[in-house]
From Swiss-Prot:
Transmembrane segments: none
Any single GO BP term: translation
Region Disordered, residue ranges: 105-134
Compositionally biased tracts (Basic residues): 115-134
Chain intervals with Basic and acidic residues compositional bias: 105-114
Family: Belongs to the universal ribosomal protein uS9 family.
HAMAP family reported in the protein's UniProt record: Ribosomal_uS9_B
UniProt source species: Cyanophora paradoxa
Protein name: Small ribosomal subunit protein uS9c
Length: 134
């Protein structure tokens, strides 16, 4: 059987400039990000790994599904939080009973914060040049 036939649910997550497309497959709890194991891709950073696994752990499903993720754009922080949102959305597709738990843990909330653009006449987005009275 091909992986397309086994796929239980899809979810897309976004954060900053990162986009993560998440697929859930029945399995033992393995997480692959861009064809690499999650801990290798996330450089063994425990906070990123915890963010990725948190929707599964809050439902107690950490060893029920294999997670296959394709991510693009941004850095590891944005990608890991985009994966978290995509995974939570995919889990909601599997069973609607998961939705209230995920919502109460804020896994279904899209974090809209992004870098503010630089304005002309300023050094950065809000940093103005030094004021001189005379």
């Amino acid at each position: 059987m091909g992986q397309k036939e086994q796929t239980l649910a899809y979810g897309t997550g976004r954060r900053k400039t990162s986009v993560a497309k998440v697929r859930l497959i029945p399995g033992k709890g393995e997480i692959l990000i861009n064809s690499k194991p999650a801990n290798l891709y996330l450089q063994y950073n425990l906070s990123y790994l915890a963010a990725v696994k948190s929707p599964l752990e809050s439902l107690g499903l950490a060893n029920e599904y294999n997670v296959i993720v394709n991510t693009q754009g941004g850095g590891l922080t944005g990608q890991s939080e985009a994966i978290r949102l995509g995974l939570a959305r995919a889990l909601c597709q599997i069973s609607l009973t998961h939705r209230p738990l995920l919502k109460s843990d804020h896994h279904l909330t899209r974090d809209a914060r992004a870098k503010e653009r630089k304005k002309y006449g300023l050094h950065k987005a809000r940093k103005a040049p030094q004021y001189s009275k005379r």
